[in-house]
């Protein structure tokens, strides 16, 4: 696909001014995860420490700027670098990412499926996750209407898999096969420092 024709737009990441999700069809199909190496010009921004972390999904790329950079100054350059680099060879992706799965899941819940969640008169929260599994809390919906809870869980899982195909399973608190694992869900940041 000609990069000039590829639609792309930025989406702010709540509570993280250094992060932007660039909504763009990446063409990666089943390849998602942390970008370790990228072709230029995107790769040059990583090597030059303009970009500190990039996570690739099928419908976007999440980008964190290194401290000392801002989107007002770097946004256009990052956008152009994404467009010029996506169709080039040389991408090396670190297979799966618990951080990316959580980001995609929260974005699906609060964005793509926000109307369905609101219509179900419930809240949805990602309680735990690893790189291939999610535990969801669907609020009081399961006790009020287990069938509606199962349907909402399935819709969430399907929407996430479109963007993160490595998702293998979801469970819900109070639902069938629910369990509670103790996992660290603190997102890590690959931020460079001069220390």
Regions found by a protein language model. Give the residues of each.
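Domain-level signature for proteins that mediate thiol-based redox and metal-cofactor handling
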Residues: 1-195
């Amino acid at each position: 696909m000609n990069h000039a024709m590829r639609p792309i737009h930025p989406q702010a990441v709540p509570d993280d001014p250094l992060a932007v999700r660039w909504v763009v069809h990446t063409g990666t199909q089943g390849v998602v995860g942390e970008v370790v190496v990228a072709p230029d010009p995107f790769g040059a921004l990583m090597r030059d420490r303009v970009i500190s972390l990039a996570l690739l999904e099928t419908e976007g790329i999440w980008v964190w700027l290194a401290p000392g950079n801002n989107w007002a100054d770097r946004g256009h350059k990052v956008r152009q670098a994404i467009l010029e680099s996506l169709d080039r060879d040389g991408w090396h992706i670190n297979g799966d990412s618990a951080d990316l799965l959580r980001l995609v899941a929260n974005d699906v819940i609060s964005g793509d499926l926000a109307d369905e969640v609101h219509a179900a008169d419930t809240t949805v929260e990602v309680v735990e996750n690893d790189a291939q599994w999610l535990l969801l809390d669907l609020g009081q919906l399961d006790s009020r209407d287990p069938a509606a809870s199962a349907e909402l869980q399935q819709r969430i899982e399907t929407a996430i898999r479109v963007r993160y195909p490595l998702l293998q399973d979801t469970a819900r608190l109070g639902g069938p096969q629910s369990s509670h694992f103790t996992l660290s869900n603190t997102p890590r940041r690959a931020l460079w420092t001069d220390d």
